[in-house]
Amino acid sequence: MTVSSHRLELLSPARDAAIAREAILHGADAVYIGGPGFGARHNASNSLKDIAELVPFAHRYGAKIFVTLNTILHDDELEPAQRLITDLYQTGVDALIVQDMGILELDIPPIELHASTQCDIRTVEKAKFLSDVGFTQIVLARELNLEQLRAIHQATDATIEFFIHGALCVAYSGQCYISHAQTGRSANRGDCSQACRLPYTLKDDQGRVVSYEKHLLSMKDNDQTANLGALIDAGVRSFKIEGRYKDMSYVKNITAHYRQMLDAIIEERGDLARASSGRTEHFFVPSTEKTFHRGSTDYFVNARKGDIGAFDSPKFIGLPVGKVLKVAKDHIDVAVTEPLANGDGLNVMIKREVVGFRANTVEKTGENQYRVWPNEMPADLHKIRPHHPLNRNLDHNWQQALTKTSSERRVAVDIELGGWQEQLILTLTSEEGVSITHTLDGQFDEANNAEKAMNNLKDGLAKLGQTIYYARNVQINLPGALFVPNSLLNQFRREAADMLDAARLASYQRGSRKPVADPAPVYPQTHLSFLANVYNQKAREFYHRYGVQLIDAAYEAHEEKGEVPVMITKHCLRFAFNLCPKQAKGNIKSWKATPMQLVNGDEVLTLKFDCRPCEMHVIGKIKNHILKMPLPGSVVASVSPDDLLKTLPKRKG
């Protein structure tokens, strides 16, 4: 079931079912979560039982559950993946998010399919092809600008999904192989080693140092708060928050922030609506700056900018809160712009390194001045001079609000009570239009105090506090003011609410697999390099079916043994350091950027620059010891050392 053209979907991440529930309660219209396997997040999997219990919880609010199955699959994994998809379909999940086109060749139920960001969707041609082969929703590349987003929206009937917040992969998604080349851990299989967060020294083609030991491939975090209206106008309808590794506080906070932002836009513009049911009330003030982030950027949505990198540190340093005045043996004295509290997380930057500590005890010593006793005094603090900047990356009092009930979500219901003295008829109608009728037989006499009786009936019917509903309207259509004992009225109302729950769940309609277009589409390329991530025979059959003639194996197949682009990125270090030939020359024919090098210890990577599309290619070579390892996902690779030990003959004696 695609998102209607005027409905906006806020899509939140969930590491587990508990976080998924809180995401929904804090305003998510849909949640994406990993299943038992193949979910592109190595340590964020969930059992079928947990997902099966999560689905009806979500559907009571009209919210959807999307399960990620977005790794590339080895041939040995196809049958287990097929079984898993069948099991997931039976739990009632709404859609699968997939990368591997081999899945479309499997014998699977008619479940709705979404194209993962790992599919690297940057062009109109590719987006239209994926829509035509059966994808209902497509996640576009984070690097696209508003004009490109609009062009894709206008060319396809697929729902456009776009990341609006969270960590940014420096490479185009699905186009990063540096982790596998260096460690054997494949990003396309959910096990990225995050080489992009390491410090590097940048050298020019003469070996001169341009930048020394900075985190040159580490991006700031995505934040599209200011661009939501423009993204809506460009055709985005699903607004995705990154973060399936993030904790509950992060998901609560960021979901609440974007719920409020989108609700304000919906209220202001009469042509939009949210994609699920209910209204959400938050019991805290959301702040994108108080949970993990590396600084904020809107990336390339409006234009290329020079400050998209978090070069100093990939860690969360928080907000400036003051200055260190003095460092003593067991405490520090600080001047601050905001009050401090016991338990706050504080830090200073020393030589590009974050030196952090937890405030065990704080004591106010003067106006805007505190004495802080850390839980453990970092030795490096004694190296700083007076007036060194102080940051806070954990606001203890604010975080405490998130550990409690921090949101409430309720669905509107209209209540009508009719009938006569021998039978009461109660009708509940939800905001989606689902209606139930419940009757109560008895002898209900006229009340002595008509006004009081009518008020009691209205108040009693509106008491929905133990349900997910709130009374939008209460209408009494009785021949007179009848007296109904509170105990009977309460039971009557509770039974009706349970009936409405069941009716709404029964009326919920999930989407199904979109049929392939007729005539069948043709893939826009006839030759696929390893960058297409084709790792199994079913994926080969898929691409051959749609006109591809020559298909190279995925990088994880270990057929690319020489130097190749192990990362392709829109981030350009020449641009970041004002060394871009485009900045200096106006003639496109004269653009020529000489290679550079990134150095981390013994690891040397060559940087090549493709100036026409403004891309940087990080060139590397897979390590020899990785070539000798079993292919990721193969039966051999899945056998653990303990399993191998069990096959050895036992020693005698």
Where would I find each of the regions flagged by the language model?
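Short, polar loop motifs at secondary-structure junctions
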Residues: 99-103
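Residues at the C-termini of beta-strands that transition into short coil/loop
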Residues: 117
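Short, glycine/polar-rich helix-capping loops at beta-to-alpha or helix-loop-helix junctions
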Residues: 122-126
